[in-house]
Amino acid sequence: MTPEFDEEVVFENSPLYQYLQDLGHTDFEICSSSSPKPEKCLTTEGPQPPPTRVLQRQGILLKLTETIKSWTFSSQHSKKDDLLHKLDTGFRLDSLHTILQQEVLLQEDVELLELLDASILSAGQPQQESGHLPTLCSLATPNTWDVSLLFAFISLLIMFPTCWIVSSWLVWGIILFLYLIIRVLKLWRTAKLQMTLKKYRVRLEDMAANSRAFTNLVRKSLRLIQETEVISRGFTLVSAACSFNKAAQHPGQHLIGLRKAVYRTVRANFQAARLATLYMLKNYPLNSESDNVTNYICVVPFKELGLGLSEDQISEEEARNLTDGFSLPALKVLFQLWVAQSSEFFRRLALLLSTANSPSGPLLTAALLPHHILCDVTQGLPHAHSACLDELKRSYEFFRYFETQHQSVPQRLSKTPQKSRELSNVHTAVRSLQLHLKALLNEVIILEDELEKLVCTKETQELLSEAYPILEQKLKLIEPHVQASNSCWEEAISQVDKLLRRNTDKKGKPGVACENPHCTAEPLVRPALHIEDRDPIPEEQELEAYVDDIDIESEFRKDDFYHLSQEDRERQKREQEESRRVLQELKSVLGFKASEAERQKWKQLLFSDHAVLTSLSPVDPVESVSNSEPPMNSDTEKVNSNATEEETSKPCAGDKEDSRTEYVCDSPTEGPSKDTSADTGLLLPGAEETMCHQHESEAKSPQAAAAGATAPPTPRDTLQLSIKQRLARLQLPPEFTFSAGLAAEVAARSLSFTTMQEQTFGDEEEEQLVEGGENEVEEK
């Protein structure tokens, strides 16, 4: 061989030879690496026939021994390798067939699989019997080795009659029994391995089916959300409730629960499929073409994808902000990402389970079977698919079939009362109205779009005239929906009118009592006297109400008391005791009790004539005055009724005209005597000093008044002293407390808002004297 051709020589089994074979080049010269030496030996030493014959004989013997050895010692290993190869190939073909039949791959991924490994697509064709997993019957059939051993055993028995001796049967039986046990154990292991592969194939089929069902359910959910938005927006525009821009401001308010469920489930499934694909790329690498990162979405960072897709969990508020309130465009983008990622996962799994990547016969072991790879790759992906599918299905069925589920109630009309049947009729009418309006809205939207096209286009008059009959036909198609909507509306109105009439008839029947035990009949309220809002309400009325001892414990509900804590109960008790103490001090300072007639006179004095819209009746003055009192005085008079009766039955001695006298009792004794005098309202004779101030006793000295001397009433010919001057004449005892002084000051201020004028009944001369006194006051 000349040196100029050395560059074109390729040695067999060299790296260059293997590389060229992989590239498909076969048109080159092949030279064996051991060929030059024998050629050189032959040319230099010449032919030697005896050594050649020896070498030939040795080669034949070696080949014969190797054949016998391989047939005797390696038959079991070859059988095992063949069985594992059948299981491996059958599982791979069944898995590829499942992936292709479930239609979980996009068209782009199918084309990429055809480019990378065309044998994968052939697995999707109807498979032959050799392509499936071997069945248990095929695994249990005896092979050539078993048959040969059986024939050898039978021939041995025939050739040696001595083997038929009874003593040798035990030995042959034990040998045969051990062989059967070994054979059954091997068959059981093979069957167990076959069942495991079948179980993982079913799991892969379920995972692919769940992925496809989840994709279809997300597509239905998005369609339902879109239809709801379009219908609600259309009804808003038709009803002219608000503008289009205002209607489109918050589209996420429709089916917000379904939107959240779609976002959560799609996000979880996307993350699980992404992690599984990255795990395959990292732990099970293939060739450079299959592992090219430009063909995978899973290598794109989360930040570039957006929409809250990250490994960390995010709150609902963050997801709402990142998706613009779970808007429909954001959910559609997320759905497209999920579809691409799911298809990418199954594409990579198909490449990994391809028969081209199956290990060769000697290297194939039970640990390298593809079901281990499938279990390691998927891990928690099937559980994520099934959980997300169940969650989204519940949410979708709730929002889609909520009314349908309620519509199933009229199926039991025979067992339901008349009220339920009528309500179901109303529901049926409203449901029919909704369906007709939905169909009507779709037709109107299509017609509106066509009219916009006709308006915007610059067509000739002839083409426009041809379009008019088409518009007329479409309007006629809309007419049945309008008529059906009107009939459904009238039916619903009539059913509701029947229910209303029946309800009013039941309410209008006499003798229908209220069955609620907590319902109490309201008493008839007597018409109150209306007072003009020009003069302030006298504070004396409030003081009189405060002075009276109101039974707070009786008005306090015991039911509410048990709901209070221990601290609240103690606090209320302290407040009640403090209120009683203040009331007793007020009574000791302002300790006077007036009779009903006296109260009537005080009310007439406090309220001017122009403040009352309706005049007081002279026949029943007590009743008319009691009607004109505020609500707080009515409660006070009920409490003081007993004290009033005692005062009217036992008047003060020497005082014949109680209407002209005001008693102010100041006792020098301690608090208990004050409380007793305040509770009874009686004057203590002789034990305490009593100051009796008459309205016409101006000439009387203050010393006599302080001594407690009482003078008989004289004719009222003097001017009336003001209330502030009379209160100033009071000599307060040293035991007068701060709160009592404050109450006295408040009483003085409240009584100084008007000039008191006395009125008596029955004596005309006294009335004339009163008028004369008023004139003198005006002159001064």
Curated annotation (Swiss-Prot):
Subunit structure: Interacts with USH2A (via the cytoplasmic region); the interaction associates VEZT with the USH2 complex at the stereocilia base. Interacts with myosin MYO7A and the cadherin-catenins complex.
PANTHER family linked: VEZATIN (PTHR15989:SF5)
GO molecular function, one term: myosin binding
Coiled coil region boundaries: 430-467
Pfam families reported in the protein's UniProt record: Vezatin
Segment forming the signal sequence: none
Knockout mutant characteristics: Embryos die at the time of implantation because of a defect in intercellular adhesion.
Compositional bias per record (Polar residues), positions renumbered to this chain: 624-643
Tissue expression: Expressed in developing cochlear hair cells. Isoform 1, isoform 2 and isoform 3 are expressed in testis. In the seminiferous epithelium, present exclusively in the acrosome of spermatids (at protein level).
Localization: Cell membrane; Cell projection, Stereocilium membrane; Cell junction, Adherens junction; Nucleus
Biased composition (Basic and acidic residues): 647-663, 690-699
Biased composition (Acidic residues): 761-780
Membrane topology term: Multi-pass membrane protein
GO terms classed as biological process: cell-cell adhesion; chordate embryonic development; synapse maturation
Low complexity: bias regions: 702-711
A single Gene Ontology CC term: stereocilia ankle link complex
Annotated transmembrane regions: 140-160, 162-182
Protein name in the entry: Vezatin
Family: Belongs to the vezatin family.
Gene transcribed to yield this protein: Vezt
Disordered as annotated region, ranges: 620-718, 757-780
